[in-house]
Every structure is written in C-alpha cells, then in structure tokens.
C-alpha cells in the first residue's frame, strides 16, 4: 500500500498538513506486506509462519472518543510506518476500552456515549474488512484525527478522502457481524491480566506497559529477537 498516494487523496488541506507534522510516514512508501486474513476475534492471523514467528504483537486497547487514545494513535502510533517498526510488529487494534454490556438489556454501554459505541463498531469493522494493516490504519487514523478536531461525526468523509469503498464496512456495521466483533473484543479486554485501568492500554507481546505507553517503541525494540532491527531500534 502506497501511504503517500493514499493520503494525497484527502480533501482537507488541514488534515494533510497536520498529518505531515504529526506523522512523517506520509512521505514513506510502505513496503508491500502479505495480506492477513482475520477471523472475527481478530486473534488469528494467517501469514507465512516464518514471518509471523519473528514479529511481535503490539496490541492497543482503546475507545474511539477518548482524547488520550486519539492523540496516541495520531501523534505516536502512526510513526511506526515511518521508522520501520511496523516491519517487526503485528499491530492489533481493539476498540472497546471501558465499554460494558448492560446485563438487563444486553445493550453495549460506552463511556463516552452512544456515538462512541458506533465509532467503536465502525473501527472494529474497518479492521475486519480491510485486512491490509496499511489500509485499515490509514482509515482509523483519519477517524481519530476527526475526533481530535471535534468533527468525528464527519467520519464518512474519510472513505472518500482516502478513495476507499465504504459499503463493505457499512454492511459489517449494520449486520450481526459488527456486534459479534465488539462482543469478542469485550471478552478479550475483560481477560486482560492484569486488568486495564485506563486507555489506551498498550501490550507488547502479552506484557502491558502501563502509563509508559508513549514509550512503546523502546519496549518493542527490547523484546525483538530478530536479526534485522528497524531504524527505530538502532
């Protein structure tokens, strides 16, 4: 996926300018990656076993309308595509956070209201439908940028800005699949050990890094046992 071309389609000059400032990987043309097939729990990744065995799992547990989560994704996490860290990571985005299921109504309740529930499901479907991490991260980056700008209700514009077809993602949201994805994320988040106490909750190879989440690169580099360390680890 050519990230530079992808973001050059964005219609908002302020969005493009801020992306350049916050995330230099706009100028970086990502190397091609094998396409991974994710099942509904986003826990199984089917790729070349030799590639997967050398990669680290970087899991980010977050919620769509949380300001700290949006800032982390836009201004920090996005840098992995510029400094090469993405080449040693299986990036997993789990949009559930502090949501819970109301036991009497079985309805999902989100910390920041029903809009956040919709955006959590939107992002869960984005990851599930757009299996290429470059594509689904670019779209989620756009969603979270709009959260920072206070324009999150304009999320549909991200599809047109990036030249992506919204229909498959919307079909997921409006079907039972969207709910199933969120239910599985709820179970996964509840099984965190130790339990998460805030968001974003960042886990490197099953090791939570707590309040030092903005320094996740150092933890990833320390955990990496491969032979070809990316620029970020040198």
Please provide the spans of the model-predicted regions.
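C-terminal cap of thioredoxin/glutaredoxin-like
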Residues: 2-23, 30-35, 58-61, 147-234
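A compositional signature for long Ser/Thr(±Pro)-rich, low-complexity
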Residues: 26-28, 41
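A short beta-strand-turn-helix
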Residues: 41-56
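Sterically constrained small-residue positions within well-ordered secondary structures
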Residues: 49, 82-84, 193
């Amino acid at each position: 996926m050519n990230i530079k071309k992808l973001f050059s389609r964005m219609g908002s000059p302020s969005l493009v300018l801020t992306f350049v400032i916050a995330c230099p990987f706009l100028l970086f043309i990502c190397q091609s990656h094998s396409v991974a097939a994710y099942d509904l729990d986003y826990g199984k990744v089917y790729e070349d076993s030799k590639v997967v065995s050398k990669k680290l799992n970087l899991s980010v547990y977050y919620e769509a309308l949380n300001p700290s989560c949006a800032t982390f994704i836009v201004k920090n996490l996005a840098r992995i595509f510029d400094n090469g860290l993405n080449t040693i990571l299986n990036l997993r985005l789990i949009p559930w956070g502090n949501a819970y299921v109301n036991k009497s109504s079985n309805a999902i309740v989100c910390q920041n209201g029903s809009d956040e529930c919709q955006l959590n499901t939107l992002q869960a479907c984005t990851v599930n439908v757009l299996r290429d991490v470059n594509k689904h991260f670019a779209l989620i980056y756009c969603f979270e940028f709009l959260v920072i700008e206070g324009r999150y209700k304009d999320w549909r514009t991200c599809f047109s800005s990036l030249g992506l077809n919204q229909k498959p993602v919307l079909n997921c949201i409006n079907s039972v699949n969207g709910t199933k994805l969120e239910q599985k994320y709820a179970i996964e988040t509840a099984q965190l050990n130790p339990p998460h106490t805030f968001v974003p909750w960042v886990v490197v190879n099953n090791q939570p890094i707590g309040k030092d989440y903005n320094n996740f690169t150092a933890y990833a580099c320390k955990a990496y046992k491969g032979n070809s360390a990316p620029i970020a680890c040198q």
